[in-house]
C-alpha cells in the first residue's frame, strides 16, 4: 500500500466532468484505490471553492469522502517546510508548497498533481 498525497488540482478535476484533466484524475484515483490517500487541509479547502460557488459544496464533500482519504492538518513543520520551498522556488505558490511539504512530512510514495510545472520539484511527484 502506497501513501499518496493529492493536490487540489486532482480533486478539482475529479469533481468537474468538463475539466480537461477529469478523465486522467478519475483513472489515477482508480489506479490508487487501494492506497493510503491523503489530502492537505489547504488543498481540501481549495477543491471545495468551485463547488461552493455553484451551491454544490455538500455534493463535493460527499464525493471526496467516498474516496476514503484522510485530510491532513497543516502542522508547524509543514508550514516551515513550505516556507523553505517558497524561498528556494519563488514562482511556487504557497498552496502548492503546502502540498509538497505535506508529502515530504509524511514520506509519501507519490504526490499526485495536475500541474506539469511540479515535475522539476522532486522524484515523488507524478503529473496527471
Locate the predicted segments by residue.
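Acidic, PIN/NYN-like endoribonuclease modules and their adjacent C-terminal/linker elements
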Residues: 1-3, 46, 100-128
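Short, well-structured N-terminal submotif of metal-dependent ribonuclease cores
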Residues: 1-38, 51-62, 116, 120
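Amphipathic alpha-helical segments within well-ordered protein domains
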Residues: 45-48, 83
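Internal alpha/beta domain cores that form substrate/cofactor-binding pockets in large enzymes
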Residues: 61-64, 70-74, 119-128
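Active-site neighborhoods of divalent-metal-dependent phosphate/nucleic-acid chemistry enzymes
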Residues: 71-114
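Alpha-helix capping/helix-boundary segments
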Residues: 10, 43, 78, 98-99, ...
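Histidine- and aromatic-rich ligand-binding microenvironments
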Residues: 6-7, 39-41, 92-93, 115, ...
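Short, hinge-like loop/turn segments at secondary-structure boundaries
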Residues: 54-58, 90, 127-128
Amino acid at each position: 500500500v502506497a501513501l499518496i498525497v493529492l493536490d487540489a488540482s486532482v480533486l478539482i478535476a475529479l469533481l468537474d466532468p468538463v475539466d480537461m484533466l477529469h478523465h486522467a484524475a478519475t483513472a489515477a484515483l482508480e489506479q490508487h484505490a487501494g492506497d493510503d490517500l491523503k489530502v492537505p487541509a489547504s488543498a481540501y479547502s481549495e477543491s471545495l471553492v468551485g463547488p461552493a460557488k455553484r451551491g454544490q459544496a455538500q455534493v463535493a464533500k460527499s464525493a471526496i469522502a467516498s474516496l476514503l482519504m484522510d485530510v491532513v492538518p497543516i502542522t508547524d513543520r509543514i508550514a516551515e517546510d513550505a516556507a523553505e520551498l517558497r524561498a528556494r522556488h519563488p514562482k511556487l505558490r504557497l498552496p502548492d508548497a503546502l502540498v509538497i511539504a505535506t508529502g515530504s512530512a509524511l514520506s509519501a510514495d507519490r504526490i499526485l498533481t495536475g500541474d506539469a510545472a511540479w515535475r522539476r520539484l522532486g522524484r515523488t511527484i507524478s503529473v496527471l
